[in-house]
């Protein structure tokens, strides 16, 4: 109803403010809108914005509404339009919308955007050689985006950057077999290799998820020590979950277990305390 539309307008409307943490001064950026994303580039020179645009559909959830993805200057001036995404009300079951998705800054570059695009029309049953591709666009965002990588299956994760700055950890998923392939991609040269693969249903052999650390620019990279990166997991076993912390060779197969919870209590890695030689874990017992 019109009342539902008015409620959505009211609850989704927001303003963007820059806040000086020292003095508490604030500065409004842009106009009031229905923002779903506002993220500065690593060097602070640009702002990545996504805002919903009406009319509002009563058939799909809000994250399928039409939206505009833009790059602004820090004072709210439009620099470039990245994508005008239409209402996604005809997405196939298990499919994805058309156009750029998972749009984000490269954590280890001043101002470079990456995103994923479907090559199969978003239709998971379409017969194609590749389903997705990874795209790159650098400032000033007025040229054509560059294709970096083509995936045979659907890309489901692209947010893990290594300390060296040029390597992206990307995950693609084979839907029918419920299988995942984890790639390492050099986004400067385009070189890529499968690091490891896993069965989604084999919880006993699940290697877990990467541990991250924040950069001074507010973005995140993999927690890394030399050629080793850190993984944490729930540690499913016949005795129940026994969470663990591992150190894995980046691009290789060597793994070192640093911690695993005892079977008579429940413990899990929480965070590193300073360097990689100390960490905090939580312990629970009955």
Regions found by a protein language model. Name each.
Residues 1-286:
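Beta-propeller folds
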């Amino acid at each position: 109803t019109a009342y539902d539309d008015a409620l959505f307008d009211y609850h989704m409307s927001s303003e963007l403010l820059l806040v000086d943490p020292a003095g508490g001064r604030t500065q409004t950026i842009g106009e009031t809108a229905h923002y779903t994303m506002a993220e500065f580039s690593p060097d602070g020179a640009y702002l990545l914005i996504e805002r919903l645009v009406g009319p509002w559909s009563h058939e799909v959830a809000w994250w399928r509404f039409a939206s505009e993805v833009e790059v602004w200057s820090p004072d709210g001036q439009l620099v470039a339009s990245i994508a005008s995404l239409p209402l996604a009300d005809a997405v196939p079951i298990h499919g994805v919308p058309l156009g750029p998705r998972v749009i984000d800054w490269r954590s280890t570059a001043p101002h470079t955007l990456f995103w994923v695009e479907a090559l199969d029309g978003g239709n998971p049953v379409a017969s194609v050689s590749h389903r997705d591709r990874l795209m790159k666009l650098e400032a000033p965002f007025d040229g054509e985006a560059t294709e970096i990588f083509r995936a045979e299956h659907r890309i489901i994760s692209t947010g893990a950057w290594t300390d060296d700055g040029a390597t992206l950890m990307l995950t693609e998923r084979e839907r029918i077999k419920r299988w995942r392939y984890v790639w390492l991609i050099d986004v400067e040269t385009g070189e890529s290799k499968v690091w490891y693969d896993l069965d989604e249903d084999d919880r006993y052999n699940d290697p877990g998820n990467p541990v991250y650390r924040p950069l001074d620019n507010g973005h995140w990279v993999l927690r890394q020590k030399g050629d080793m990166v850190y993984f944490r997991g729930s540690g499913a076993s016949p005795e129940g979950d026994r969470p663990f912390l591992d150190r894995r060779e980046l691009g290789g197969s060597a793994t070192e277990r640093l911690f695993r919870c005892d079977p008579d209590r429940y413990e899990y890695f929480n965070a590193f305390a300073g360097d990689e030689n100390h960490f905090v874990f939580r312990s629970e017992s009955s």
